[in-house]
Structure formats: C-alpha cells, structure tokens
Amino acid sequence: MKIIKVKDQVEGGQKGFEIFKEGLANDAKVFGLATGSSPIKFYETVVASDLDFTNCTSVNLDEYVGLSADNSQSYHYFMKENLFNKKPFAKSYLPNGLASDIPAELKRYDQVIADNPVDIQILGIGQNGHIGFNEPGAAFDSNTQEVQLTESTIKANARFFENEADVPTKAISMGIGSILKAKKIVLFAYGESKAEAIKGTVEGPQTTDVPASALQLHDDVTIIVDEAAASLLSK
C-alpha cells in the first residue's frame, strides 16, 4: 500500500485527481466511483479540470434500497449533482434501489462489473472499516449483495437526512471481491474518526472485522489521508 499524507481534503482531492488524470492518459476507460463526503473535493477538482470522460464508463459502488434515483439522498442524485451533470460519461452504472426483484438486480450488477472491468476504483471508508456498504463480517470474496446497514453506519449517515428514522436500513453494494478486481484502488480518509479504521486497514491483520483490511490483498492501493486519519499509524 502507498500512503499519501495531505494537509487537508483540498490537497487530497488534488492528489486523487492526479492519479485519475494519469490513468486517463494511459487509456483507463472504466472508473469505479464512490459517494459520501470523502471524495467530494476530489470530484470538485475533476469538474474544474479539462478531463473528458465522454468515451469512458463509470460503475458506482452502491445505492440505498428504497430510494428512487431522483430522491435527493440517493446516490444516483449525489453523482449527478457532484459529477455527471458537469462531466458526463458515455455510460454510468449504479445499482437500482427500487428493483422489485433484488436477487435479479444483484446478478445484473455482477454482470455490469464483469462486462466493465474497473481500471481505477475510488473508495471512502467508514468508521467501522466498511468499504462500499460491506459491513464487518462481509466475506473478502463477496460479489454484489444486499446489505443490512449497521447501527453505526445509519447514525453516521443520518447527518444527510432530516431524521435518523429516514435513513434507509438496507443497501445494494458491490462486494469486497468485486472491489478487489479493480486494477488500481484509491481510498480517501479524513479526520480523527477514521484513524482507527485506517490503522486496521494498513497495519492490522486481514480480518472481516475490518472489511477494508482486505485491501492488503491488492497490489496497487493508494490511501490518501490527512494527519488526523493517519494519527494512529506507526509510520
């Protein structure tokens, strides 16, 4: 793993952008995208640039079950607001949170991933070490799955909703096994609340108790952290 320490999210976003730009110059065509607060400055930097994704494909990590694409808290909406409206891709894939047949939707999304191997995957990380919505206990070889969100994840995401009761309790998420198939992975983490998860990811044992520790199995991972998120690392 390569650890890049930055002073703030703006610098972190710039570092991530440089990796994206280099990938695009080297014919990367499929970009795995994440939502949440950690990649926002990265997306702002991409939007302000002259990068062109009109010949590229995006594949998102996850979506809440029960939210329509036009719901302001859905990840479809997040991606349109933060990236797609300004930087369109030829094709953009996200799980369908309103799918009437969830098992069929999981199979469909696994096929999307198989048909569009990811060149560069963007990740954030939860306080409990989750990547995507792969909560502690998720198998390292898992494919796309419906996930029951943990209490800590629901509480962490409540800030985006009017009431905690409005936070969906389930999501469809690309599995850890699917994430590990990406050629290159870039993870953003900021703030003291992520320090424990980052220590477990980088220096802890490979354990399903810390889903992101699975990244130790991958040979091209860059972790972009501020000093607070890196504060528990031994070096």
Swiss-Prot record:
The active site is at residues 62, 128, 130, 135. One of its GO terms (cellular component) is cytoplasm. Catalyzes the reversible isomerization-deamination of glucosamine 6-phosphate (GlcN6P) to form fructose 6-phosphate (Fru6P) and ammonium ion. This is Glucosamine-6-phosphate deaminase. PANTHER family: GLUCOSAMINE-6-PHOSPHATE ISOMERASE. Keywords: Carbohydrate metabolism, Hydrolase. GO terms for molecular function: glucosamine-6-phosphate deaminase activity; identical protein binding. Belongs to the glucosamine/galactosamine-6-phosphate isomerase family. NagB subfamily.
